[in-house]
A protein has these predicted regions:
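Surface-exposed, flexible loop/turn segments at secondary-structure boundaries
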Residues: 65, 96, 122, 132
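Aromatic-enriched hydrophobic runs in primary sequence
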Residues: 58, 70-71, 153
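Acidic, Ser/Thr-rich peripheral helices and adjacent loops at domain boundaries
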Residues: 109-119
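Non-globular targeting/processing and membrane-anchoring segments
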Residues: 1-55, 77-84, 100-110, 124-189
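Conserved redox-active cysteine motifs that mediate thiol-disulfide chemistry
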Residues: 63-70
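Thiol-based oxidoreductase modules, predominantly thioredoxin-like and allied folds used
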Residues: 58-62, 75, 83-99, 117-119
Length: 189
């Protein structure tokens, strides 16, 4: 995956609120439910609001996927904390086979997979399919299929822990971008 390829995929992606409109009424309800429950703490808002490097964030998702329902709205909330520096888009896994084949996790076409890029679409990191706290919650419950449907929203503690995991990853990428000698030279800082 090079910057040209990623730029094309990003351009074809949809902003969050347009992406969820691709789902059925029930799917849209599930995504809105988690989005409405998700809230950054004041410290998280301040942290994301302090990002100075532009980040491109592309999520490979499935509107039908329970893990996407329970994690993508959290990433959108982070992006909303600094819309001038965090540009987030989503693409459908099944409509982007060429992309997902390059992002296989444990030999599977897992989603969500988040691709973090610099302002010029240079890849900086790939994260998926679940955060550590999401895995802990699933292991504790030991219920349902390997890809839950997102019918029941996560409890508030799980939601907050998973949001914190995603915030850590956004911060890690921002620090990578901020400390990049290539970008520091470009921006003279």
């Amino acid at each position: 995956m090079n910057s040209t390829y990623l730029s094309e995929k990003f351009s074809a992606g949809l902003p969050y609120h347009k992406y969820i409109l691709t789902g059925t009424e029930e799917q849209q309800r599930r995504w809105r439910q988690v989005y409405d429950l998700a809230a950054l703490t004041d410290a998280q808002k301040q942290l994301a609001g302090g990002f100075v490097r532009e980040m491109k964030v592309l999520i490979v998702s499935g509107i039908w996927c329970g893990d996407c329902v329970q994690q993508c709205p959290l990433q959108q909330r982070i992006a909303e904390a600094n819309p001038g520096k965090i540009d987030l888009r989503l693409v459908d896994r099944d409509q982007n086979r060429d992309l997902i084949e390059q992002l296989r996790i444990n030999a599977g076409d897992r989603v969500p997979v988040t691709i973090f890029m610099a302002e010029d679409f240079e890849p900086c990191g790939v994260f998926g399919d679940r955060t550590i706290n999401r895995y802990r919650a699933l292991a504790k419950k030991q219920l349902g299929p390997s890809c839950p449907l997102g019918v029941i929203p996560p409890d508030q503690n799980e939601l907050a822990a998973t949001l914190s995991d995603w915030m850590d990853e956004f911060e890690r990428i921002q620090l990578m971008l901020r400390l990049s000698s290539r970008l520091r030279s470009k921006h003279a800082d």
